[in-house]
A protein has these predicted regions:
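Conserved short submotifs of the Hanks-type protein kinase catalytic core
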Residues: 67-81
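Conserved HxN/HPN-centered segment at the entrance to the catalytic loop
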Residues: 53-62
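AlphaC helix of the protein kinase catalytic domain
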Residues: 82-92
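Activation segment signature within eukaryotic-like protein kinase domains
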Residues: 100-101
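Catalytic-loop of the protein kinase fold
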Residues: 112-128
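ATP-binding glycine-rich loop module of kinase domains
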Residues: 7-43, 47
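Conserved activation segment of eukaryotic-like protein kinases, specifically the C-terminal portion
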Residues: 151-165
């Protein structure tokens, strides 16, 4: 017996491709249309998720082709995006910034462990759940890091969050996501881009500055380093 799907809402998206909230027998998920070019790497991402847990990353339930179009069904996380929070309520508290950034470090470290980079870590692509956890969503421009490739074949990413190497001069790697994470931390703390204002907290300011160095060589090597620095800033009595 075929189960019935109900489309509950068309969701806002940065692309013109289909994104909708679906209910099926009491189960809710998000269906997104992806391109033929995105399909192989997102399929690989899905297979990695089946093999090992991925903290702070939206779960992909299925990746498939139907009538010449490609789709993913992914977890629906109840909450609001960082972008929505900044628009409606302004910057986050320092403790919130640190906790959410630590969540994202764990998620990005998972990507990087599997030789993948997200390449679009922005306020619109981070959801704060009702349980107050941060999740990376929309792995639409995921990329596998390829050995011996000197530059990216396509210029992708959100202006302001895209690291210089994403503009085709050198190959992007884990430090590309680190650059975007630094910009995101700054946005959460101040509501502004780093060139406009930096966090008041000296240690947070130092983290943002190192993450967003123009030269990838001067940034943190990995997200674990950032996680440890953030943990040192977090008050001891914070759960």
């Amino acid at each position: 017996m075929e189960t019935k799907e109900t489309i509950l809402a068309k969701l806002n998206t940065s692309t013109d491709r289909l994104t909708e909230l679906v209910e099926q027998d009491g189960f809710y998920f998000v269906r997104k249309e992806i391109t033929r070019e995105q399909y192989p790497v997102i399929k690989q991402f899905y297979e990695y998720q089946q093999q090992s847990p991925s903290p702070a990353i939206v779960t992909i339930y299925s990746v498939y082709e139907k009538e010449g179009h490609f789709y993913i069904n992914e977890e629906w996380i109840r909450g609001e995006s960082v972008e929505e929070h900044l628009y409606l309520q302004g910057p986050f508290s320092k403790d919130e910034v640190i906790r959410y950034a630590m969540d994202l470090c764990q998620g990005l470290q998972w990507f990087h462990k599997h030789n993948m980079i997200h390449r679009d870590v922005t306020p619109a692509n981070v959801i704060i759940s009702e349980e107050k956890k941060a999740y990376l969503v929309d792995p639409g421009i995921l990329r596998e890091v390829k050995k011996n490739q000197t530059n990216d074949t396509q210029i992708l990413g959100t202006p302001g969050y895209a690291a210089p190497e994403q503009f085709g001069f050198t190959q992007s790697d884990a430090r590309t996501d680190i650059y975007a994470l630094g910009v995101l931390i700054n946005q959460m703390a101040t509501g502004k881009m780093p060139k406009e204002a930096l966090p008041k907290d000296r240690r947070l300011r130092k983290i943002v500055t190192k993450c967003t160095q123009i030269s990838a060589e001067k940034r943190y090597l990995n997200c674990h380093q950032i996680y440890k620095q953030l943990d040192a800033v977090l008050p001891e009595d914070t759960p």
